[in-house]
Regions:
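Short, well-ordered coil/turn segments that N-cap beta-strands
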Residues: 2-4, 48-50, 72-74
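Alpha-helix-loop-beta-strand connector modules within alpha/beta enzyme cores
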Residues: 60-84
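Active-site mouth loops of central-metabolism enzymes
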Residues: 22-35
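Short, charged, surface-exposed secondary-structure boundary motifs
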Residues: 39, 84-90
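Hydrophobic faces of well-ordered beta-strands that scaffold small-molecule active sites
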Residues: 6-8, 27, 53-54, 76-78
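N-terminal basic/disordered segments at the start of proteins
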Residues: 1-14
Length: 95
């Protein structure tokens, strides 16, 4: 089965954006906190999203919580940043 429905959750501001073609659809959801990512992921699964990617603002702990919250229904990946990005990421995502 080919990937035809992709979801991306980013921390920042609340928004929903959809784009795609007749053969591929993408939904991008912005959330203000990692906690809100759980509801966004559940909604994506309910809509038939086949794969969810989380922005680098989600820690491995939050990725695990989201995976558990959707009961492992679809694969969930996390964007990763190398050691050279640690200082910059700390400025963007304090605490």
């Amino acid at each position: 089965m080919p990937l035809t429905r992709f979801g991306f959750i980013v921390t920042g501001d609340d928004f929903v954006q959809r784009t795609g073609t007749e053969r591929f659809r993408m939904k991008v959801v912005g959330v203000r906190s990692p906690e809100q990512g759980i509801a966004a992921a559940r909604e994506m699964v309910a809509e038939g999203i086949q794969l969810i990617e989380l922005c680098g603002g989600f820690s491995p702990v939050w990725a695990g919580k989201i995976i558990e919250a959707i009961d492992y229904a679809v694969p969930v990946g996390v964007v990763a940043y190398g050691p050279e990005s640690i200082t910059g990421m700390a400025r963007l995502f304090p605490g």
